[in-house]
Curated annotation (Swiss-Prot):
Taxonomic lineage: Eukaryota, Metazoa, Ecdysozoa, Arthropoda, Myriapoda
Signal peptide positions on this chain: 1-19
GO cellular component: extracellular region
Protein's name in the database: U-scoloptoxin(16)-Er11a
Source organism of the structure: Ethmostigmus rubripes (Giant centipede)
InterPro entries, per the entry: SVWC_dom (IPR029277)
Family: Belongs to the scoloptoxin-16 family.
PTM comment text: Contains 4 disulfide bonds.
Alphabetical UniProt keywords: Disulfide bond, Secreted, Signal, Toxin
Length: 119
């Protein structure tokens, strides 16, 4: 019984590691807690990565333009750009107020010391 359980757990871990590496799109869950957006997460931004947020009309795309890296932020209103470096870690923080689907997230980027190349 123990070996069967270990085999199932091993297969589950392999599946998780494979599924996390598929494609460049990552979805993160959001919650509506007392009428506010609840999402506070650090994630590694790579060039070409797109982040889609379920239950909120937001997406972030890391892109390169004129040798400068940006995170393109699509909100309910209009897209705008946040200047970032390849391999930066972005902290997605909920606004102080806002209900679905009108909530928009702030993006704060900090340097990732082990991932500084701009290739």
């Amino acid at each position: 019984m123990k070996s069967w359980t270990a085999a199932v757990l091993s297969l589950g871990l392999i599946y998780l590691s494979i599924s996390q590496n598929e494609g460049a799109t990552t979805e993160f869950p959001t919650m509506n807690y007392e009428g506010r957006c609840a999402l506070d997460m650090f994630t590694l931004i790579e060039v070409g990565d797109t982040f889609n947020y379920r239950h909120a009309c937001l997406s972030y795309t890391c892109m390169k333009r004129d040798e400068t890296f940006y995170v393109q932020v699509h909100t309910c209103d209009a897209p705008h750009f946040e200047n970032v470096t390849s391999g930066m870690i972005c902290n997605f923080t909920p606004p102080t107020t806002g209900n679905f689907p009108d909530c928009c997230l702030k993006v704060n980027c900090i340097a990732h010391l082990n991932h500084t190349s701009a290739n």
